[in-house]
Amino acid sequence: MVAQGLLDFQYEADPSSRGLTSLGGLPLYFDLIKASGLGAAIRRHVRAAGGQGWLDIQMVLAVIFLNLAGGDCVEDIERLERDGGFSAILRAIEKDLLSRAERRSLKSRWRRERERATPSPSALSGWLERFHDPNSPKAVAGKAFIPAVTEALRGLWRVNQALLEFLHEHQPAKSATLDMDATLIETHKRDALHCYKKFKAYQPLNCWWAEQGAMLYSEFRDGNVPAGHEQLRVLKESLRHLPESVKKVALRSDTAGYQAELLLYCGEGKDPRFGVIEFAIGADVTEAFRAAVLATPESEWKPLIRRVDGKSYVTDQEWAEVVYVPNWAGHSRQRADYRFLAIREPLRQLELGDEQELPFPTQAFAGKGLHKPFGMVTNRKGPGDGVIWWLRERCGKSEEVHSAMKSDLAGGQLPSGLFGANAAWWALAILAFNLNAAMKRLALGESWAAKRMKALRFHLIGLPGRVISHARRWIIRLGGGTQALATILDARQKIRALAHGPAG
């Protein structure tokens, strides 16, 4: 036998590989899809598929499983199709996820017997293109333009709303802290536009629900649209997606949210449902703001102390509340109480004149040297340092979530040159993210809540096994010991209980 490599082992194809799977834990998500009513929500809201071929529910679930399994692109659906065990279990339980009318329609939707368990890449691409409006004006460089949301895409967001209502029903929270932040998705699509960082990109504006650890809403945008553009409109749309039992909302944003209409809307209680919305938002460091910072007495500056696990750590930053009333705040009809906080961070080891080359504003303080100033505006009560740390909670989490969407899931590799198809792909990646959030929080337990997809694939989803049919039952026999099996069985029992209503 010819040596295959340096060491004494050989690779061979296994002719008896039928039923083998490397995704032994992935079918656990079928249980949660059934319990959450996700299939019914897809059936009720998504209307993209035609009268022939694959159903909308089959398409949506295929993309969700592609994301969970680690796929990056439409072509990776073939990885699921070639997994004999997963394909077998998908075919076997598909009927339990379809309505009676859908099951009856399957035969008439296909001219000959269906051979695949999952849609082909070409079928999936064609379905995604149905989310695009061919009559929508084309975006052009130099102008911020956001295409209207198509009815098909709106349907996907209604499905996401239904999933979050299920999560909220079993993990209720009367308040919602919303973090608004944009992220750049680099692309080489011909019609994509350049972002502020000078590469081609799309830039969705996202609204994260901190208490539920889930994405509430996202507006897909071209890369040349500024993050703060029409942020109030996106906030209003996000608020409409919150469950009825949520009574209070708070908002956090970086300086992209420093928009007069947004601040006045929140501060003056203009929202008909939530009234005053508490917020902390990064403020622009304008010349007027810098003057107010310089006018603040040294006695007002306090060290910014970080508290971790009951211990206090003095940072090199200081903060102070500054007397500053910008024009928009002076026009407030309700005389809302806006507070401005300043943070200063010392800049060390700078040569004379180097501050002119820095990509951020600097400020010299008498006797204190050169500093990098930051600003924020809030209508929250309480100590200023507490508000600062509350705002900063969003920063690391936003970066983590965006990384998960673009690297752990398939959101970072867009499938099409059509805006609407890419918007649907992004929405489906978010749907997969939120389904996984529900799995961790409601079924797997607290120890799994902080785990990212890499850990879930290693310990749960990517388990080796064999799928067999015996006595009219389908069985997934897992390899790799009993710990993973115990985790899955416990999760299945919890999901079974979820299907019968909220705890308590």
What residue ranges belong to the model's regions?
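An anionic, glycine-rich sequence signature occurring as long contiguous blocks
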Residues: 2-11, 15, 275-407, 493-504
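Short amphipathic alpha-helical "interface-anchor" segments enriched in bulky aromatics
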Residues: 77, 384-424, 428-439
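Basic, amphipathic alpha-helical segments enriched in Lys/Arg and hydrophobic/aromatic residues
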Residues: 412-478, 482
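Domain-level cores of phosphate- or acyl-group-handling catalytic modules
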Residues: 225-288
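Conserved short loop/turn motifs at secondary-structure junctions
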Residues: 48-51, 181, 249-258, 420
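Short, glycine/acidic-rich hinge or "gate" loops at secondary-structure transitions
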Residues: 80, 92-96, 249-252, 443-453
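Dynamic "connector" segments at or just before major functional cores
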Residues: 1-201, 206-224, 232-244, 272, ...
